[in-house]
Structures are given as C-alpha cells and as structure tokens.
Amino acid sequence: MKEIRIHGRGGQGSVTAAEMLSVAAFEDGKFSQAFPAFGVERRGAPVQAFTRINNNPIRLRSQVYTPDYVIVQDATLLETVDVASGVKDDGIIIVNTTENPESLKLNTKARVMTVDATKVAMDIIGVPIVNTVLLGAFAGATGEINVESIQHAIRARFSGKVGEKNANAIQKAYKLIRGEEA
C-alpha cells in the first residue's frame, strides 16, 4: 500500500487533490481512499489531506503517519510544519517552490523534489491554484498513477475550459518534474 500526505492551507484545495488522486487511482484499477484531517481551521490555516492506494481492498481507517509520499502545496509551511515527519526513507517529498531541493534543507532521507507549480498554474490556468498541478508532478515523480488517469479525473470533476486548462497544467508539471521540459 502507498500512502500520500498532502500539506496545504485551508482553501488551497488539498482535500480536492486527495480526492482526485483517489479517483485517478481507481481509474488505474486500484483501490483507494481519501480523507482530510482538520478541525475548525479557517481559510489559510495549515491542513492535511491523505490518500491511500493499494492493489487490494483497504481496510485501514487511521490517519497517515508514515507516508511514502508527501506533497507540499505552499512552501511557507516548511517554516511552521514538519512536513518530513514520518516520511519513509525511500519516500519522495514534492514541494511547490522556485527553490532547488538542496536549499530547502529538510531533515529527511527521503528524496526531495521541487516544481514551481504556482508559475505553471498562473501560466496555464490563470489563477494560483496549484492542487491539480501538483498531481501532475506526483505522477511524474512517483509513477504510481498514470498522468492520463489524473487528467481524466480532473476533466470529470471540472468541465469545459476549466477542466481542459487543469489537464494541460497537469501535463506540464508532469514533464517539468521528470526533466522533460524547462
């Protein structure tokens, strides 16, 4: 089973990202679940959302404490939240930032990867909403989910131009994190 923890701020779409990742996993023929972890937080407060993906039914119902993968939607969270907490040594942490991975100095043995998802979102979607963009980066970095499945899940959730722009941004982030585009 693969476990993913998404760090964001209230209103950034962390829960939607976890749900779309779960739907994409289902599209790939896998079992999945997605759920948030927040209380009475307001817009802008740190939140977490989780996705589990497995080839067999998932019976576990607890929060994710030792993720294989971590997605950080807002790099300012690195100052206040230990995003690397519990991540497996062979895991991957994907951070939305203009910085290079080495400059982040995260206390982890996991591989740290960065992508400027905000720029991709602004250039293609026209708004700084990075949740879907980072799912493309996740697909490219991990190979756990087909990028086409993520695009299909997004198009099913957001119709018309919004869905298409998001699908294009997903493809761009997928290529960026794999080093296929500059």
UniProtKB/Swiss-Prot annotation:
Pfam families: POR. The keyword Glycoprotein does not apply. It catalyses: 2 oxidized [2Fe-2S]-[ferredoxin] + pyruvate + CoA = 2 reduced [2Fe-2S]-[ferredoxin] + acetyl-CoA + CO2 + H(+). One of its GO terms (molecular function) is pyruvate synthase activity. It comes from the Archaea. The keyword Oxidoreductase applies. Gene3D superfamilies: Pyruvate-ferredoxin oxidoreductase, PFOR, domain III. It is an enzyme of class 1 (oxidoreductase). This is Pyruvate synthase subunit PorC.
